[in-house]
């Protein structure tokens, strides 16, 4: 199946895993070792609220290409049966859009752009 035929939910499914892995690698590299602290710190990067915040910041910085933003919109506008535990529908959809972009960049082997996206999010910093 062509990756451009994947729906937003499928791209977000992969993107969730990619972003979670990047966050976990970063936290371990920073020296965090206690599971309770790792879990709490990771939430400030991968929660729906954090991801929506990152998406807004990236958009304000004009980070996305037209093609990338189309993927974000595809993820954001997808209708999912699931919903976030601690976020409203708008926040959840925005986070799904960012996850879709992570998934698409990974699946299309755009490693340099994926790295640039992650580095820009790290510059924005941990969501409080």
Regions found by a protein language model. Name each.
Residues 1-128:
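Double-stranded RNA-binding/processing signature
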